[in-house]
Structure formats: structure tokens, C-alpha cells
UniProtKB/Swiss-Prot annotation:
It comes from Mycobacterium tuberculosis (strain ATCC 25618 / H37Rv). This is Putative threonylcarbamoyl-AMP synthase. Residues 14-199 form the YrdC-like domain. It catalyses: L-threonine + hydrogencarbonate + ATP = L-threonylcarbamoyladenylate + diphosphate + H2O. SUPFAM superfamilies: YrdC/RibB (SSF55821).
């Protein structure tokens, strides 16, 4: 049975977080608000739940799922090593609308899709998302839409696409940014912007001390 909670109401928010935590621990899917767009999430270490997430979206393994974290320190156990520039970008833009692609720790027992030893990480700037992430740990999260359809910027848009595939919808009103996060790849010799977004290339270049044009090389 699908449940929806209005997180503008403190009591519903509290009950919603409890319900979402239970759903995630049971291997089910949850729709959650973030600062960019609404996301559909699962326990990052539950491969069956991640497979269900991809199925709900109609998405193949060739488009692996990113991971949201609830604190800066969480990523220390998820990456092989902190690449050059990662700490600077995290200090400048986390929590916020910047996703970083890094080489994952080889010991991790998860299956996020065909990620070829990499993982995309982000710490969202949203109190409901952070509260949930701090309760359950890292979550595999993708935009809460059917593949090829517009990413939802509110819970109703997400529910209209995903319906009963999701156990719990946490409704916190419209997303602030209403656009997907900026994605920066830190797995190569130099940083590259894979997807422009709310965090501008110019701001990223300034933090890294490089020319903005080099980020598209």
C-alpha cells in the first residue's frame, strides 16, 4: 500500500520519516524531496531494491544510479581515495546541487548498475532528505520519473509517473532549484563537467583554480 505524507505538517513529517525508514529497510522504494528535483530512492546496499528502482523508471543498467549521503564524512568509506579538487568542491558546494563522480572503494558490496568502478555522490540541501539519509545511511537515488519523461519538481508529478511502484511519498512542496544537479567527473586526469546545472561552471572553475573552458575538455 502506498502512503503519502505532507512534510509541511510536523506530525506528518515525523510519521513519514519513520514510514520511509521502514520501507527502505524492507527493500522498498521511497520518493523524497531534494533541493534539485524529487528523487526515487532505495538502500544503496540492497541490490534487489536498486534493481526495482531501475525497473520502476524503465531504465537499464547502462545508466547507473547515483548515491546521496547525509554528511560529508560518509563519503570517506565510499571512495577509493579523495581525488584532487574533491575536498575543495565539497567544502564549497555541499550540501547542494553538485554531484561528483569518483572511483568507488573496491570493497563496497553494492550494485548500482554498470558504473565501471565509479560512483556519483551528492549531499542534498534539503532538511527532509538529510533527516532520512542520516537515519538510513547512503541511498541509491535517481530522479523520480519514468525514463525519458521530465523529472518531477513536486510529489504529485512523481506519483503520477511512478504510482504504486513506490511505498512512501514524502511531499515537501515544490523543489527549490527545479533542475538536475551539476555533475563533475573527478575520475580522470583533470575534472570534467558532464552536465551543467545550478552550480555554474564558472563557480566550479574558481574553486578549482582552473579555466572554465578546461572543464569541458
Amino acid at each position: 500500500m502506498t502512503e503519502t505524507f505532507d512534510c509541511a505538517d510536523p506530525e506528518q513529517r515525523s510519521r513519514g520519516i519513520v514510514s520511509a525508514v521502514g520501507a527502505i529497510k524492507a527493500g522498498q522504494l521511497v520518493v523524497m524531496p531534494t533541493d534539485t528535483v524529487y528523487g526515487i530512492g532505495a538502500d544503496a546496499f540492497d541490490s534487489s531494491a536498486v534493481a526495482a528502482l531501475l525497473s520502476a523508471k524503465g531504465r537499464g543498467r547502462d545508466m547507473p544510479v547515483g548515491v546521496l549521503v547525509g554528511s560529508w564524512h560518509t563519503i570517506e568509506g565510499l571512495v577509493y581515495s579523495m581525488p584532487d579538487g574533491a575536498r575543495e568542491l565539497i567544502r564549497a558546494f555541499w550540501p547542494g546541487a553538485l554531484s561528483l563522480v569518483v572511483v568507488q572503494a573496491p570493497s563496497l558490496q553494492w550494485d548500482l548498475g554498470d558504473a565501471h568502478g565509479t560512483v556519483m555522490l551528492r549531499m542534498p540541501l534539503h532538511p527532509v532528505a538529510i533527516e532520512l539519509l542520516r537515519e538510513v545511511g547512503p541511498m541509491a537515488v535517481s530522479s523520480a520519473n519514468i525514463s525519458g519523461h521530465p523529472p518531477p519538481v513536486d510529489a504529485e508529478q512523481a506519483r503520477s509517473q511512478l504510482g504504486d511502484h513506490v511505498a512512501v511519498y514524502l511531499d515537501a512542496g515544490p523543489s527549490e532549484q527545479q533542475a538536475g544537479s551539476t555533475i563533475v567527473d573527478l575520475t580522470g586526469a583533470t575534472p570534467r563537467v558532464l552536465r551543467p546545472g545550478p552550480v555554474s561552471t564558472e563557480r566550479i572553475a574558481e574553486v578549482l583554480g582552473v579555466d572554465a573552458a578546461s572543464l569541458f575538455g
